Amino acid sequence: MPLLDPNTQTLAESSAAQPQRLPFPPVTYSHILHCSYHQWQPRYRTLTPKSRAIPLTPSFVSYLRANGIVLPPETTRPHGDDDIDTFSDDGADEESDPSVEWQEIHSQIKSTISEFGGKVTPKLNWSAPKDAVWMSATNDLQCRTPNDIYLLLKSSDFITHDLEHPFDGCVPDPDDSSEAPATQPDIPYYLVLRKYVNFNPSLEFRCFVRNRVLLCMCQRDQNHFDFLFSLRDTLRSRIQAFFDEKLKDTFPDPNFVFDVYIPEPHQRVWLIDINPWADRTDPLLFSWLEILQMKDPIGIKEEDTDAPEESFVRLSLNGATPTVVEVNRDEDSESEKDVGSADDGDDSPFLPEFRLVKRDDPEAYSFSTPQYSAHKLPKEVVDASLAGSGGMSEFLGKWQDILAKQTQEDTDSDDGR
């Protein structure tokens, strides 16, 4: 039997102590549906920015799912008999207008853009096409025309996930007593158009709720903002009060993640989104393992009950995983003294950890770092897609010629060696 180097053995033991899979509770179909915008927004309408949810027809959903990017013409052709000769072009462009199958939705989008002052931001039931903003002239989600919206939706992997994989990793609800094999529920898809607001990204925060307890929170933008540290206590208090009064007892599930925006003067909290308690939701400044192993008041009480009378309970975890103390050790002590004091007294209120990007964090100055770069395509591919099926076929032909030429050159080079 070979001997292990002590360091290797320690590493192996550490790896063994780590769970092989994140210890999430089962994610049910209903939980995913509860986090769909059309499900939660009516309940919290007064807490959200102004928006409209447009029900989507099967033909429009099929358009989003279809390969290639074919956009409707910017101007609508007349359909009267008197105008046929004037605008006739032998029907060459008749098939190039995909909106003929969903004219009502197209008209609703136009009217909503006009109603909201000419600028909106789009999303589907769960996701906004943030990974496709590089396709936009403004490099954000701002849309002024229906075609701006269609271009973002059809260029986004996030939207594709909403359409094709919303229930990945999910299980049927435990109260489903049907003996028939569980089938995924039908999804009524919606296009959500929100009035465009130039949000200050430094004031957006993601909050994690477990067992109806606000467990922790962090900033969404991963750049350092020095002014946030002096506001940490105020913002934490605002978010905690908002959660206690508006969300704690009203959202159907005990575990979820929600996003808020708190603009100056930091008096009002706006609910921006609600996300599943699942690894598909980005934990941002935390890791999911770290969050799942955090203690909340319920876990602390259970630990107190199980502990012998002569022992004491420490807010730490066995093994090589981060402890509560270790997680907090990097936080600015001056800003987080109240969290430490809250843990010392039995009657002290539980305070969620509020994590901010510090000045010396490696990711603190990523202003020039492009987000979602893995989702981008070469400009030539995008241009070919915009030209329709013919443009893409021409591009593929040229690409194959280039590959064949490169292969031939490599072969000739090998033969001459």
From Swiss-Prot:
Stretches with biased composition (Polar residues): 1-18
Binding positions (Mg(2+)): 273, 275
Location(s) in or outside the cell: Cytoplasm
Keywords of the record: ATP-binding, Chaperone, Cytoplasm, Magnesium, Metal-binding, Nucleotide-binding
Compositional bias segments (type: Acidic residues): 82-96, 329-347
InterPro entries: CDC123 (IPR009772)
Binding locations of ATP: 123, 126, 128, 130, 194-195, 204, 206, 220, 259, 273, 275
GO biological process: eukaryotic translation initiation factor 2 complex assembly
Region (Disordered): 1-23, 72-96, 323-352
GO MF entries: ATP binding; magnesium ion binding; protein folding chaperone
GO cellular component: cytoplasm
Primary role: ATP-dependent protein-folding chaperone for the eIF2 complex. Binds to the gamma subunit of the eIF2 complex which allows the subunit to assemble with the alpha and beta subunits.
Family to which this protein belongs: Belongs to the CDC123 family.
Listed name of the protein: Translation initiation factor eIF2 assembly protein
